[in-house]
Amino acid sequence: MLLISGLLLTQGCLSTTPEPSVIGDLIIAEPIAISYKNEIALARLTQVLQRAEISDGQRAELFYQRGVEYDKVGLRALARFDFNQAINLKPDMSDAYNFLGIHFTQLREFNQAYDAFDSAIELAPDHEYAYLNRGIALYYGGRPNLAADDFKVFRQYQQNDPYRLLWQYLADVELDQKKANQDLVVYALQVGDRVWAKNVIKLYLGEMSQGTFIDRMAEDVNSNEALAERLCEAYFYLGKYSQLQGDANAAINFFKLALSTNVYEFVEHRYAKLELDLMRETALESREP
């Protein structure tokens, strides 16, 4: 891993002069590269789809699997094509609807995202991640009250998962900051102290400084892949934390750092780009006369 200090906030360059919005040394992982396993999986699935005589149901499953592989390496348009093909062949494929909803959210096509997630939940009422993903779509679509309801359902499936608590908090804080903080204190009691992501909760509650949080980001990580995954999460939630603190410049850089990991399939990577797009739009609108 590489340590850098003094991240230049507005230009994304390195500087020997520390900036006040960034505390301490930042950890950078080598971006995750496309593995040969992904390439082989894509080649094999394509070969079977082109040559094999199979049923529509089997073909739908193969399109779905290839869509997932495309999604893992960031080829979103190809993934969407395959998910649509899967649904055309097998209209009751809830997982394909769930993925399409995620992609529509990333494209900010929120009404289409809601429809896709509604279909996923109608087909599979216990599809817990469809509730998470619909909640995220509602959150970015400016409906935090409905998002909070979906995050609550998602949280009930595993109440000691810190990430479920964090998304609940991000919606709740839009509605009532004081109550959101009080609720997070209670929810956090169910999360073990040895779970790394509890540090994010402590940061949000003011129980840990940003500097200490950054110092602990690489704790108990023994490979570059694990480090990249950890940093993808950490920098995304630092970005959201910076937003809550009113530090837009720091938030922008943290979201860029989350993107730099190339962990395409993580929720945090997916929405770091959306966060940047939204912040750029806000900045442009504020400059207009």
Language-model features: where?
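N-terminal leader/linker segments that initiate helical-solenoid repeat arrays
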Residues: C13-E61, Q65, R280, L284-P289
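Helix-turn-helix repeat elements of alpha-solenoid scaffolds
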Residues: I32-T46, G74-A77, Q106, Y140-N145, ...
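Structural marker of alpha-solenoid helical repeat scaffolds
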Residues: R51, S55, L89, L123, ...
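Helix-start (N-cap) detector for alpha-helical repeat units in TPR-like alpha-solenoids
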Residues: D56-A60, S94-D95, E128-Y129, D161-Y163, ...
